[in-house]
């Protein structure tokens, strides 16, 4: 589903006021749940989380940090809920055998970098990872899940959307109040410019790392042809804007709901549009793994990575995490 418009800014107007009692109950329930004491893993645990519903860049950050740990020679394993997949886990993801319908799109991307375990029960997933030889764990999401104790919690913030209208679900996009979440965080990562003033709501003592999304050059994929871009991610407009910034000639932009399961009718529509326009179909890696096999050969996936403002900042962050966990 798409986020309601009243979540995106201002005070949310009358819909947010109408939903304020439900938001208060949600806040209370979250606070009570977070009082639980989770399982303490025998290895360091880092969580890439956020405070809002929807995409903020958590998976991109998890991929980046896990790749850095692999480069250090660490036996890092990644934990994810497997949103959009049927598997409850714990299940070690095999990209050659599992589909997005089974384990979710994010798990398939994460498994390309390091062993990835899908588990709705984070503690059970951590136990499976440790038994499989993990010497450190990176969680993709799960900041509001108390089942597994975290040595370091990171808040990933999308600079374009920030904290929306500042209200908690369902009155706004927040999973919990900003102040409450910041008390458990060790650092924040701002992706893109702070266009909504989100940083003003963070405690002054909370370290903030800055990064931008770096999109793969798409022009070589097009050979002079126009493109039809489509995406079913948290904020598809970010993907479309990134292509426009490269000067790509977009014949059409088609947003789909986050984690959309592409069906035969979607394939027929995309194929027909590409044929009529003489265009190349462009999408994100997360969408590519959800496509039916019949159309994958027609689609080009445009990768996105992180470009850190301070290239050494993520390395210092990992040092701080590992040093804290070993002390």
From Swiss-Prot:
ATP binds at residues 52-59. SUPFAM superfamilies: P-loop containing nucleoside triphosphate hydrolases (SSF52540). Its EC number is 2.7.1.130. InterPro entries: LpxK, P-loop_NTPase. GO terms for cellular component: plasma membrane. The keyword Lipid metabolism applies. The keyword Lipid metabolism applies. One of its GO terms (biological process) is lipid A biosynthetic process. Keywords: ATP-binding, Kinase, Lipid A biosynthesis, Lipid biosynthesis, Lipid metabolism, Nucleotide-binding, Transferase. GO terms for molecular function: ATP binding; tetraacyldisaccharide 4'-kinase activity. Pathway: Glycolipid biosynthesis; lipid IV(A) biosynthesis; lipid IV(A) from (3R)-3-hydroxytetradecanoyl-[acyl-carrier-protein] and UDP-N-acetyl-alpha-D-glucosamine: step 6/6. Pfam families: LpxK. It catalyses: a lipid A disaccharide + ATP = a lipid IVA + ADP + H(+). It is an enzyme of class 2 (transferase). Transfers the gamma-phosphate of ATP to the 4'-position of a tetraacyldisaccharide 1-phosphate intermediate (termed DS-1-P) to form tetraacyldisaccharide 1,4'-bis-phosphate (lipid IVA). PANTHER family: TETRAACYLDISACCHARIDE 4'-KINASE (PTHR42724), TETRAACYLDISACCHARIDE 4'-KINASE, MITOCHONDRIAL-RELATED (PTHR42724:SF1). Belongs to the LpxK family. This is Tetraacyldisaccharide 4'-kinase. It comes from Gluconacetobacter diazotrophicus (strain ATCC 49037 / DSM 5601 / CCUG 37298 / CIP 103539 / LMG 7603 / PAl5). The lineage of its organism: Bacteria, Pseudomonadati, Pseudomonadota, Alphaproteobacteria, Acetobacterales.
